[in-house]
Design a protein with these regions (language model features):
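Conserved glycine-rich cofactor-binding loop
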Residues: 8, 15-16
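The beta1-alpha1 cofactor-binding region of Rossmann-like NAD(H)/NADP(H)-dependent oxidoreductases
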Residues: 60-71, 104
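Substrate-binding pocket helix/loop in short-chain dehydrogenase/reductase
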Residues: 97-99, 106-108
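Active-site loop-to-helix junction immediately N-terminal to the catalytic Tyr of the SDR YXXXK motif
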Residues: 102, 148-156, 168
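Active-site helix of classical SDR
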Residues: 122, 158, 166
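Alpha-helical segment proximal to the catalytic Tyr-Lys
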Residues: 127, 171-175
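Residue(s) in the substrate-gating loop at a strand-loop-helix junction
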Residues: 142
Length: 182
């Protein structure tokens, strides 16, 4: 029996990288998954999980869209009866464009996915978890949110925002049985 046996978990950004690896690992530990990505690649991740005997539902959705986030969280609750954990992992790098050449639209897109996305995941998962008096919320951050480097301006700013969002949310969740980390 795995450490996540029977737990209902949502993972965004599950089409590749950390999200794909987490989906496979969580499934091996017994989690029942709803995995989300904006691309068809999420179906490949679902096949890896399913072929290994895991329980999984793949959803193609935009982790920065409030309607999509609410829908995939509600889908997990409807399918599995509860939501034990969510990992807001979807993100975009934004590239290494000189600041003077960046556009407001470029910044808005990076912030929409990397910061608004985790905010929406928190906003729509918290009520379910508070009602259960348990749950775990994880948001992918980065050292780029703590220290300047070559990661790009909007990326670093978005990850600094995620760190602050998680810290302030942890304070507000005190005593609810729900924990949050980045």
């Amino acid at each position: 029996m795995g450490r996540l046996e029977g737990k209902s978990v949502v993972i965004t950004g599950a089409g590749s990288g950390i999200g794909r690896a987490a989906s496979v690992l969580f499934s091996r530990e017994g989690a029942k998954l709803v995995i989300v990505d904006k691309t068809e690649a999420v179906k490949e991740t679902a096949k890896l999980v399913s072929d290994a005997g895991g329980t999984v539902e793949a959803v193609i959705a935009d982790a920065g869209s409030e309607n999509d986030v609410k829908a995939f969280i509600d889908k997990a609750v409807a399918k599995y009866g509860r939501l034990d954990a969510i990992w807001a992992n979807a993100g975009v790098s934004g590239g290494l464009v000189p600041l003077a050449e960046q556009t407001v639209e470029h910044w808005q897109e990076v912030l929409r996915v990397n910061l608004i996305g985790p905010f929406l995941a928190i906003k729509h998962s918290m009520p379910h978890m508070i009602k259960q008096k348990s749950g775990s919320i994880v948001c992918t951050a980065s050292v780029a949110g703590l220290k300047a480097g070559a990661s790009g301006h909007p990326y670093g700013a978005s990850k600094a925002g995620v760190i602050s969002l998680v810290q302030t949310t942890a304070y507000s969740l005190s005593g609810t049985g729900v924990r949050i980390n980045a």
